[in-house]
UniProtKB/Swiss-Prot annotation:
Reactions this protein catalyses: aldehydo-D-ribose 5-phosphate + D-glyceraldehyde 3-phosphate + L-glutamine = pyridoxal 5'-phosphate + L-glutamate + phosphate + 3 H2O + H(+); L-glutamine + H2O = L-glutamate + NH4(+)
Family annotation (SUPFAM superfamilies): Class I glutamine amidotransferase-like
EC number: 4.3.3.6, 3.5.1.2
Any one annotated GO CC term: cytosol
Lineage: Eukaryota, Sar, Alveolata, Apicomplexa, Aconoidasida
Keywords: Cytoplasm, Glutamine amidotransferase, Hydrolase, Lyase, Pyridoxal phosphate
Pathway given in the UniProt record: Cofactor biosynthesis; pyridoxal 5'-phosphate biosynthesis
Sequence positions that bind L-glutamine: G52, E53, S54, R121, I153, R154
Superkingdom of source: Eukaryota
Protein name (Swiss-Prot/TrEMBL): Pyridoxal 5'-phosphate synthase subunit PDX2
Function as written in the Swiss-Prot or TrEMBL entry: Catalyzes the hydrolysis of glutamine to glutamate and ammonia as part of the biosynthesis of pyridoxal 5'-phosphate. The resulting ammonia molecule is channeled to the active site of Pdx1.
Subcellular location: Cytoplasm
Alphabetized GO MF terms: glutaminase activity; pyridoxal 5'-phosphate synthase (glutamine hydrolysing) activity
């Protein structure tokens, strides 16, 4: 089997723990690289956009007339390569970001798109309102056999699903906001999680994304 290269966007945010979690999979044919420019992106079979600060990441993609932003849009919508956004990364993959004009001047070009959802940033409050929850896995993928938990840090909230193509992979309950809160979604080549899977010991979502990239490359 030829090498599979998964990139982790390394402009800002929690990229090193993501890299370490993929290394934990111990797959000899898997190559993990940091992505900081268009050249790096061109080496990737799949890409992870980690948690961090979505407006900061978007500003980092704006240099040289949106060169990296445009390359990422091409990666997602033209090449249709697998991409996974966690927390802030999920925000950047969302079609609609609520009240984004209050936070940035990018307008309709704030997010890359790919997930037909409406999302709300920092829904649960500040850093002090972060929490760990149990996931209710809806997917039948073998990657998700074990009981899984999720770390939600200034997590976004998926307000609405806008297309039948969007599949819910996992939900959780919150004492203040009720049950069946969407934790993970998938639409074609795009995967989104509102939590930080790289901050807990399990590698289930890294395994799931690796399988997604492998299926893309060898389909």
């Amino acid at each position: 089997m030829s090498e599979i290269t998964i990139g982790v966007l390394s402009l800002q945010g929690d990229f090193e723990p993501h890299i370490n979690h993929f290394i934990k999979l111990q797959i000899p044919s898997l190559n993990i690289i940091q992505v900081r420019n268009v050249h790096d992106l061109g080496l990737c079979d799949g890409l992870v956009i980690p948690g961090g600060e979505s407006t900061t990441v978007r500003r980092c993609c704006a240099y040289e007339n949106d060169t990296l932003y445009n390359a990422l849009v091409h990666f997602i919508h033209v090449l249709k390569k697998p991409i996974w956004g966690t927390c802030a990364g999920c925000i950047l993959l969302s079609k609609n970001v609520e009240n984004i004009k209050l936070y940035s001047n990018f307008g309709n070009k704030f997010s890359f798109g790919g997930l037909d959802i409406t999302i709300c940033r920092n829904f649960y409050g500040s850093q002090n309102d972060s929490f760990i929850c149990s996931l209710n896995i809806i997917s039948d993928s073998s990657a998700f056999k074990k009981d899984l938990t999720a770390a939600c840090i200034r997590a976004p909230y998926i307000r609405e699903i806008l297309s039948d193509e969007v599949k819910v992979l996992a939900t959780f309950s919150h004492e203040s906001y009720g049950p069946n809160i969407i934790a993970a979604v998938e639409q074609n080549n795009c995967l989104g999680t509102v939590f930080h899977p790289e901050l807990l010991p399990h590698t289930a979502f890294q395994q799931y994304f690796y399988e997604k990239v492998k299926n893309y490359k060898y389909s």
